[in-house]
Amino acid sequence: MTDLTPREIVSELDRFIIGQNDAKRAVAVALRNRWRRKQLADDLRDEVYPKNILMIGPTGVGKTEISRRLAKLARAPFLKVEATKFTEVGYVGRDVEQIIRDLVDNAISMTRDHMRDDVKANAHQAAEERVITAIAGEDARESTREMFRKKLKAGDLDDTVIELDVADTSSPFPMMDIPGQPGGNMGMMNLGDIFGKALGGRTTRKKMTVSQSYDILIGEEADKLLDDETVNRAAIEAVEQNGIVFLDEIDKVCAKSDTRGGDVSREGVQRDLLPLIEGTTVSTKHGPIKTDHILFIASGAFHIAKPSDLLPELQGRLPIRVELRALTEEDFVRILTETDNALTLQYTALMGTEEVTVSFTEDGIAALAKIAAEVNQSVENIGARRLYTVMERVFEELSFSAPDRAGEEIIVDAAFVDENLGALAKSTDVSRYVL
């Protein structure tokens, strides 16, 4: 669980997302409230429920990017799902309880990684012993083992090929598709789970170099030192107390006002989400999970539907509303210059692999931003994603001929942008289809 302050969370998000301060602040406060709740006494902690968030804003302004960056900051079980993937319980397709099952699976792998770090020193020692045994043999003297241990630590044996018995991770049972259940096991028991324990301990003999064997052996030895029951218990606790679910495309499950009957992949999904967001118990193969304290952040463009088209009960369960504004030309300039993952840096690095040096001038960046903003206004506003189309068009010729132009230096200024894009941008009819 992260202990960053709201100010630190916002400044971390600022590195990748331009503007949208309201959304960043709401998310930062929600994340900090998780930490605050942990500091409370047990009886009061159970009474403090998370305030779920609804982010509303046009496409391409940073809603999904906020969730992606938040996942890295949260250090808590985190899952991002699209609401459009689900159908009402009882119909073919995934039901919303699968969200919690996936969240638990994420938490278990995250908890196992953290716990592996705690036992890494002991696991490293055990892995070293297995490598020495594989090189020197089972009945080697202690002096011989010691000699090999010194060589091993010095790195002299890294390229030596050894044969080892390692755990066979392949399942002896083929995956079976259950009709009407895409993905087969849908979070419930599959044959591998049922018989895996009984047939456990299967090993396979593999040849590998000493340096390759370390990662596999350390993982195996760490797993031997970890108790599955403890890992599962810690993961379930983390999900129930600190879990965060990001529900994208929530506007796509709004029923159109003129629709007759309950649409199974729209209103039906909303009805199923109600108890999940309010707090219910979901059965998983690792045990029941209470969703009372899981934080839900929903987001949608609400391009066609309105937030008021959501079921009133669902609106009530998303009390914090945040509006994200559309991006302007100035924002595009900042996106191309200030972010840590700016497209300008990406294209410079990509062309650098072909030994072509690319540099951007201020007027070149201004021209890119101006064209992106103009096309957004005249055709369809798709936000920052328009920069991808514009940049790809500008670099189309250079990307194709880069291998033949090694050693050249390309300056992307207003003239370069105009030469590669000018005619397209001026003709609205053409830009409608091409950009």
UniProtKB/Swiss-Prot annotation:
Coiled coil start-end: none
Localization: Cytoplasm
Residues that, per the record, bind ATP: I18, G60, V61, G62, K63, T64, E65, D248, E313, R385
GO CC annotation: HslUV protease complex
Keyword tags: ATP-binding, Chaperone, Cytoplasm, Nucleotide-binding, Stress response
Cytoplasm found in the keyword field: yes
InterPro entries: AAA+_ATPase, ATP-dep_Clp_protease_ClpX, ATPase_AAA_core, Clp_ATPase_C, HslU, P-loop_NTPase
Any one GO molecular function term: ATP binding
Entries under SMART domains matching the protein: AAA, ClpB_D2-small
Alphabetical GO biological process terms: protein unfolding; proteolysis involved in protein catabolic process
Domain of life according to the entry: Bacteria
Chaperone in keyword set: yes
Assembly mode: A double ring-shaped homohexamer of HslV is capped on each side by a ring-shaped HslU homohexamer. The assembly of the HslU/HslV complex is dependent on binding of ATP.
Sequence similarity: Belongs to the ClpX chaperone family. HslU subfamily.
PANTHER family on file: ATP-DEPENDENT CLP PROTEASE ATP-BINDING SUBUNIT CLPX-LIKE, MITOCHONDRIAL-RELATED (PTHR48102), ATP-DEPENDENT PROTEASE ATPASE SUBUNIT HSLU (PTHR48102:SF3)
Function, as annotated: ATPase subunit of a proteasome-like degradation complex; this subunit has chaperone activity. The binding of ATP and its subsequent hydrolysis by HslU are essential for unfolding of protein substrates subsequently hydrolyzed by HslV. HslU recognizes the N-terminal part of its protein substrates and unfolds these before they are guided to HslV for hydrolysis.
The protein's name: ATP-dependent protease ATPase subunit HslU
Native source species: Roseobacter denitrificans (strain ATCC 33942 / OCh 114) (Erythrobacter sp. (strain OCh 114))
Gene this chain is encoded by: hslU
